[in-house]
Swiss-Prot record:
Protein name: Cell division protein ZapD
Cytoplasm recorded as keyword: yes
GO BP annotations listed: division septum assembly; FtsZ-dependent cytokinesis
Gene that encodes it: zapD
Main location (coarse class): cytoplasm
Source species: Dechloromonas aromatica (strain RCB)
Length: 252
């Protein structure tokens, strides 16, 4: 099964981008190759750009507090495990405290590192990080994998509270909905939303379906058009057959 997630507001789009970039950074950091560590650093620079929104940290703190209050209402509910509830509340409280402990603008310590910013600037230019452009970076890439990894982890560590908070919010968002099975007739599907917009929808398609969903929506209608996987065509071609899929509406 392949799941496609479609966020309907900029805040959720930002959290999904951060999740993707933190995962890439972690993956490439754990590898030993110089090229992988370069990819990790470039992903870290992208985190810096995406997280640059002035209100992102406060948005996350407020959302975590809202979820904490929601969970508190389940105290003494016989249908809810007190142990699981206490664990979830503790995780949220720890994450909020870590966010509050992030002083100043997110990633400001990286912006104040002239050497890293010179690499970031050159990395935005196609082929801009050749050894003749950045000899000091070329030297760094020839240090031991352990030395490079320690440096990457040290640069990333102050931003990890952001990763952890985003992970909590996205986990709660994804678990808020229940999938329902639908069929797109001739590759087309429309659903009347009745004026209630979701924050995100998840479309799950069996890998054997060979169909890719394209989603558009407003608070009244959800439209899904399934296209065929690309095979060298200039323009995507629509599926002209019925496609079975699961649809999940997610809201916090």
């Amino acid at each position: 099964m392949i799941t496609y997630e479609y966020p309907f507001n900029e805040r959720i789009r930002t959290l999904l981008r951060l999740e993707d970039l933190f995962e890439k950074t972690a993956y490439f950091t754990q590898e030993d190759g110089a090229l992988e560590h370069h990819a990790a650093l470039v992903s870290m620079f992208e985190i810096l750009e995406v997280a640059g929104r002035a209100d992102l940290k406060m948005d996350l703190i407020q959302e975590l507090e809202r979820q904490r209050q929601t969970l508190l209402a389940f105290r003494n509910n016989p249908d809810i495990s007190e142990e699981a509830l206490s664990g979830a509340l503790y995780e949220i409280e720890q994450s909020s405290a870590a966010l509050l402990g992030m002083a100043g603008k997110i990633g400001q310590y990286l912006r104040e590192n002239d050497w890293l910013m010179s690499i970031k600037s050159r990395a935005a230019i196609p082929g801009g990080v050749c050894e003749f452009d950045l000899p000091s970076y070329h030297w760094w890439l020839h240090r031991s994998p352990e030395t490079r990894r320690d440096a990457l982890e040290g640069w990333l560590k102050p931003m990890l509270p952001l990763r952890d908070a985003a992970a909590i919010v996205l986990r709660l968002l994804r678990s808020s909905g229940r999938p329902k099975n639908y069929t797109a007739t001739n590759g087309q599907f429309q659903l009347n939303l009745g004026g209630s917009a979701a924050q995100m929808v998840r479309v799950t398609v069996h890998v054997d379906e060979q169909a890719i969903p394209e989603v558009s929506a407003n608070k009244y209608f959800l439209n899904i058009r399934f296209t065929k996987p690309p095979a060298g065509e200039i323009k995507a071609r629509g599926c002209e057959r019925d496609v079975a899929f699961d649809l999940t509406f997610c809201n916090l």
